[in-house]
């Protein structure tokens, strides 16, 4: 929105500078984007009258004139403008004048003829007007008056950026209202009376879409002179707001648009057949617009039409068939309230954006239409003459917006602002904003104004109070609070500690989308149901993940496609499992997942780089589990999973309950995904391992430890982990360490069996153990493994 500072000051004129005014506007939430002078820097230019105008004797394109500038004699001035003529009021730069660009006017001769000044065009004075030739001033312009004073050129054009909710400030009236509120000044609105009808002509209105157009006004004005010039003051105000003067009818409707924020339109009455219809377009209808383009109308487009077809796109663009031109004698003025949702997006649908659509789709004051009609009628009769008919209105009260009533609690206001504003001041602010307000029991009940569509909730009222009270008036007080140390159990394991351990093991943390490709997810987890998004970002991201593995495998593939063969990634996050018994029908589980592929170690001169295997990943996971309280109770139990290699996969169990899985990606799946080499993954429930071992001091034994090595022959199906657990259980407190150091199958061991070599370390804190005591521990271990696994000592 661009507006003239002087125009606003006609409505409200606070005793502040331009800079201070812009600061106020910005702090009101109407951000000032720029300020520029409406004219260049010049002096010595006055209003003159061309008394004589003759052809230059030696130049076809020059004229010799005598100009009256109010002095004791006429000035001889040579002019090359084609529109220079006798009787014209002009802008005359006299001797000594300085024009933009430090161009000084001196007496000179042009092709032998004396010239004592210059007749100026708009561009020569730094005024942005598209016009050929010199400036043509009104015939009543007082001769000798300084042009800057006559045209009020000591003015600034201020441009502001408005958020979509502040459509009420897309007008001089709205901006002045805000400035008046913050400066505690009354706004001086232009005074005009309702124009009485002098002719009986009426316009019939057929309001077929009241939900889209709850209020529609038309008025006939006959015998207008559309060739009458728009007054200079109107042209200048339009120009300073960025609108070019076209003809008096268009200029007047644009003027009302800028002054009140009410878009209006004018039809040529001779081209309209009554009744005028307000309806939605029919499929296949077309409309030739005022710019000559043809719009193929869609059924969601609101139209102004008659029995012959569309006349205009309601609230967006007029049609050429009913447009006003130089031959127009009678006009029909339109002023309406179109529902924002009926206009929103329609202009963009046709590649258009107009001042009218910009306002209607944000919301125009629904009480403004009649006032704007009266103002436009007054101006039109003053400028173009004519006779006005009665204002014809069709409206639907049930579809008109209702002003909102919102309550504001004193406690909420104080809490959000962090500052106490006197009750009377708050009430006064609401009154100055034009709201109706009552206060009782520490609650303000506020009814907003018809021009404020954005007042809907309590926070909106708090924003209004803060804006008008002044953000800079709210002190910068640090918040006061009673601090309490956050409880932290010593047994809680910080997730950051786990992440650090994995980073130390040469892993990198990944963050993948919670939305995954349902095809890939069903490939990995065919028996798990996934949540499908109703409005996904894309087809490839239309399901919620039931595991983090699909995202990590995607990251592996992404890296491999970029020549990164060694990949070690981990991720923590939620997986989403449909569960009718869970809140909202979905169980959200926080898990830790990891993936490795490529070589176990980076390339190095000291050794050959070997590919990763199952036990590399298992070892890394065991290192993580060693930090947890239940790590020594975790078991890896062979189990098959859909996504994993049947011979290289295991369930992760804690106290017999499955909390995760580990293994190699199934070769067929790896091939379908395009993965290179073997890829190993694990996923484990974080909550199951989120406790850590609380450090307990233990006395270090001063007595020697004794080691005994046993080679136990067991069936192939016996897990080594279960055998070791049985040894620890049978050995009691004196058995301080059990370690598996060899697995053998071959000569000397029957087929279907394996030899597990384990070391048993026996020690006591109180004394040196005798052989009998050591042998007792060993015998207890042998008896236990014999009973549970039918283990035999290897010969």
Swiss-Prot record:
Alphabetically ordered keywords of this record: Aminoacyl-tRNA synthetase, ATP-binding, Cytoplasm, Ligase, Magnesium, Metal-binding, Nucleotide-binding, Protein biosynthesis, RNA-binding, tRNA-binding
Its Gene Ontology molecular function terms?
ATP binding; magnesium ion binding; phenylalanine-tRNA ligase activity; tRNA binding
How, per the record, is the cofactor bound?
Binds 2 magnesium ions per tetramer.
Record-annotated B5 domain positions? 401-476
Give the matching SUPFAM superfamilies: Anticodon-binding domain of PheRS, Class II aaRS and biotin synthetases, Nucleic acid-binding proteins, PheT/TilS domain, Putative DNA-binding domain
Q: Which cofactor does it need?
A: Mg(2+)
Give the enzyme's EC designation. 6.1.1.20
Q: Name one Pfam family in it.
A: B5
Main localization of the protein? cytoplasm
Q: Which reaction does it catalyse?
A: tRNA(Phe) + L-phenylalanine + ATP = L-phenylalanyl-tRNA(Phe) + AMP + diphosphate + H(+)
Query: What Gene3D superfamilies is this protein classified in?
Result: 3.30.56.10, Bira Bifunctional Protein, Domain 2 (3.30.930.10), Ferrodoxin-fold anticodon-binding domain (3.30.70.380), Nucleic acid-binding proteins (2.40.50.140), Phenylalanyl-trna Synthetase, Chain B, domain 3 (3.50.40.10)
Enzyme's top EC category: ligase
tRNA-binding domain location is 39-148
Q: Which residues bind Mg(2+)?
A: 454, 460, 463-464
GO cellular component terms, A-Z: phenylalanine-tRNA ligase complex
Membrane spanning segments where? none
FDX-ACB domain segment(s)? 701-794
Compartments, as annotated in UniProt: Cytoplasm
Could you tell me which CDD domains the record lists for this protein? PheRS_beta_core, tRNA_bind_bactPheRS
GO BP, sorted A to Z: phenylalanyl-tRNA aminoacylation
Subunit (UniProt): Tetramer of two alpha and two beta subunits.
Member of which family? Belongs to the phenylalanyl-tRNA synthetase beta subunit family. Type 1 subfamily.
Protein name from the UniProt record: Phenylalanine--tRNA ligase beta subunit
Q: What is the lineage of its organism?
A: Bacteria, Pseudomonadati, Pseudomonadota, Gammaproteobacteria, Pasteurellales
């Amino acid at each position: 929105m661009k507006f003239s500072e002087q125009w606003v000051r006609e409505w409200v004129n606070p005793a502040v500078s331009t800079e201070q005014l812009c600061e106020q506007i910005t702090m009101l939430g109407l951000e000032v984007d720029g300020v520029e002078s409406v004219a260049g820097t010049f002096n010595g230019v006055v209003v003159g009258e061309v008394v004589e105008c003759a052809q230059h004797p030696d130049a076809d394109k020059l004229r010799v004139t005598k100009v009256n500038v109010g002095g004791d004699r006429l000035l001889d001035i040579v002019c090359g403008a084609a529109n220079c003529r006798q009787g014209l009021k002009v802008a005359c730069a006299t001797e000594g004048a300085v024009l933009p660009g430090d161009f000084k006017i001196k007496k000179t001769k042009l092709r032998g003829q004396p010239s004592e000044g210059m007749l100026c065009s708009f561009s020569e004075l730094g005024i942005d007007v598209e016009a050929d030739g010199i400036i043509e001033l009104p015939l009543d312009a007082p001769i000798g008056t300084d042009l800057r004073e006559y045209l009020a050129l000591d003015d600034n054009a201020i441009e502001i950026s408005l958020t979509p909710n502040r459509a009420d400030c897309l007008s001089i009236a709205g901006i002045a209202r805000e400035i008046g509120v913050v400066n505690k000044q009354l706004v001086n609105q232009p005074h005009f009376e309702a124009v009485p009808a002098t002719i009986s002509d009426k316009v019939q209105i057929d309001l077929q879409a009241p939900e889209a157009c709850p209020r529609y006004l038309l008025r006939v004005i006959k015998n207008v002179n559309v060739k009458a010039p728009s007054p200079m003051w109107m042209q200048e105000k339009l120009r300073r707001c960025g609108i070019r003067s076209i003809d008096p009818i268009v200029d007047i409707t644009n003027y009302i648009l800028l002054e009140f924020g009410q878009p209006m339109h004018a039809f040529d009455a001779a081209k309209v057949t009554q009744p005028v219809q307000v309806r939605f377009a029919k499929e296949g209808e077309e409309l030739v617009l005022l710019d000559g383009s043809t719009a193929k109308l869609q059924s969601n487009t609101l139209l102004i039409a008659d029995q012959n077809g569309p006349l205009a796109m309601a609230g967006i663009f007029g049609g050429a068939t009913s447009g006003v031109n130089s031959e127009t004698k009678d006009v029909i003025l339109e002023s309406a309230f179109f529902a924002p949702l009926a206009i929103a997006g329609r202009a963009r649908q046709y590649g258009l954006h107009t001042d009218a659509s910009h306002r209607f789709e944000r919301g125009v004051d629904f009480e403004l239409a009649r006032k704007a009609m009266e103002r436009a009628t007054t101006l039109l009769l003053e400028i173009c003459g004519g006779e006005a008919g009665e204002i014809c209105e069709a409206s639907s009260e049930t579809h008109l917006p209702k002003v909102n009533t919102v309550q504001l609690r004193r406690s909420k206001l104080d809490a959000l602002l962090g500052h106490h504003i006197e009750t009377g001041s708050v009430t006064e602010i609401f009154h100055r904003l034009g709201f109706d307000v009552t206060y009782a029991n520490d609650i303000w009940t506020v009814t907003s104004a018809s021009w404020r569509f954005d007042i809907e909730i309590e926070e909106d009222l708090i924003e209004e109070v803060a804006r008008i009270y002044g953000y800079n008036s709210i002190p910068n007080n640090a918040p006061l609070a009673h601090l309490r140390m956050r409880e932290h159990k010593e047994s809680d394991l910080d997730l950051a500690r786990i992440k650090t351990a994995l980073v130390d093991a040469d892993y990198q943390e990944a963050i993948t989308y919670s939305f995954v490709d349902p095809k890939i997810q069903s490939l990995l987890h065919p028996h798990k149901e996934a949540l499908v998004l109703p409005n996904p970002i894309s087809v490839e991201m239309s399901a919620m993940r039931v595991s983090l593995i699909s995202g990590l495998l995607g990251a592996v593939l992404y890296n491999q496609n970029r020549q990164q063969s060694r990949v070690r990634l981990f991720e923590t996050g939620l997986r989403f499992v449909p569960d009718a018994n869970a809140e909202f029908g979905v169980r959200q589980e926080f898990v830790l997942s990891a993936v490795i592929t490529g070589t176990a170690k980076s390339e190095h001169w000291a050794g050959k780089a070997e590919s990763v295997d199952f036990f590399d990943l298992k070892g890394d996971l065991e290192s993580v589990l060693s930090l947890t309280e239940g790590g020594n109770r975790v078991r890896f139990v062979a189990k098959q999973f859909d996504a994993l290699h049947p011979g290289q996969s295991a369930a992760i169990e804690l106290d017999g309950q499955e909390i995760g899985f580990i293994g190699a990606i199934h070769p067929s799946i790896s091939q379908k995904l395009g993965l290179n080499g073997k890829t190993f993954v694990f996923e484990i429930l974080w909550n199951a391992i989120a406790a850590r071992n609380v450090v307990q001091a233990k006395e270090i034994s001063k007595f020697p430890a004794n080691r005994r090595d046993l080679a136990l022959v067991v069936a192939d199906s016996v897990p080594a982990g279960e055998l070791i657990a049985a040894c620890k259980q049978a050995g009691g407190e004196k058995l301080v360490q059990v370690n598996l150091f060899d697995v053998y199958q071959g000569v000397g061991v029957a087929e279907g069996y394996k030899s597990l070599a384990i070391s048993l370390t026996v020690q006591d804190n109180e004394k040196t153990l005798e052989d009998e005591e050591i042998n007792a521990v060993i015998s207890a271990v042998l008896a236990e493994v014999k009973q549970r696994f039918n283990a035999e000592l290897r010969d």
